[in-house]
Amino acid sequence: MKIIQVILKFIIIFIIPSIHAQECKLEFKTEKIHVNGVTYDQKVGDPITPIADAIKADNLEEVKKILDEGYGVNQPCLGWVPLDYAISNNNIKIADFLLKRDASMSLIHINIGFMKSEIAEFLINQGMSPNLRYEDGITGMMLAAERNNPDLIKLLLKLGVNPNVQNSKTGMTSLMYAASYLNVEVVRVLLEQGVDPNIKDFKGKRALNWIAVDANRKLHASDGEYYAALFLAPFETKQKIIKERNSIKTRNKEKEKEIKKLFNSHR
C-alpha cells in the first residue's frame, strides 16, 4: 500500500506538472490591432495552456481541477502565469480564487497600465502597489495615458497616485504621454486634477511640446518594443505595418486643436 501511495505521489508531484508544462504553446489568432491610429488585421500570439483556456471560458471548476491535478498556480507559460490570464480577461472571480491558492502578484507579467480599471482596483485592494515602475522607467499611469485608458487614470488618481511623477529614463510625465498620442479625454482628466503642465522632460520639453509627437511620427522597426502589433508580428508583416503607417500624411488636426485648447484653459 505504501509503495502505491509513493508512486501516486510521484505522479502528482512530477509527472502531471511535466505534462502540463509540455502543453504550453503559442496560439495565433487574428485580431484588430491599432498602431498610431491605423487599424490592421494581425495575427497575435497568446501563450495557451489548458488552465488559460479554462480561465478564458470563465470555468472556475475546471481551473480548480487543473490545479488539484498538480499544475502550479505560479507555473509560467512563455512568461505568463495563471493570474495573468485572469487579469487579461478582467476576471475578478478567478483572480480572487488564484490568490487564495497562493498565486503571487510579484509574478504578474502584465503592466498595470494595460489593465481594465475593475481588475486593477481589485488587485490594488489585495495589496498590489498602484505606484509600480517598470524596467523602461514607465509607470502604470503613464502607460494608461499612452493607451488612452481614462477610467484607470481616474482610479489611480483617486488612490493618490502622483500624476506628476516622471519617467526615470526620459523625464516624461503621464500628461506628456497623453498629449503625444492625442488622447484628449486623458489630457482633460489630468488637467482637471491639477497636473503640472510646465514640468520639463530631460530634454527640456514641456507637455505642450509633446502634442501629437507620437501620433504623427514615423514608425521604425525598433518600435516593436513599445507597440504590441510590431512586437508580435512576423518580419514581413512588421515591415508592411511600418510602410503603410509611414505613407499616411494626414494629421488629426481637430484633436491637436482640442488638446491645445485644454492646455490654454489650464494655464
Curated annotation (Swiss-Prot):
The signal peptide, as residue positions, is: none
Q: Which UniProt keywords apply?
A: ANK repeat, Coiled coil, Repeat
Q: What are the coiled-coil residue ranges?
A: 238-265
Determine if Coiled coil is one of this entry's keywords.
yes
One Pfam family from the record:
Ank_2
Q: Give GO BP annotations, semicolon-separated.
A: positive regulation of protein catabolic process; protein ubiquitination
Q: Entry's Gene3D superfamilies?
A: Ankyrin repeat-containing domain
Task: State if Coiled coil is listed as a keyword.
Answer: yes
UniProt-listed PANTHER family: ANK_REP_REGION DOMAIN-CONTAINING PROTEIN, SOWAH (DROSOPHILA) HOMOLOG
Q: What is this protein called?
A: Putative ankyrin repeat protein RF_1099
Which species does the entry assign this protein to? Rickettsia felis (strain ATCC VR-1525 / URRWXCal2) (Rickettsia azadi)
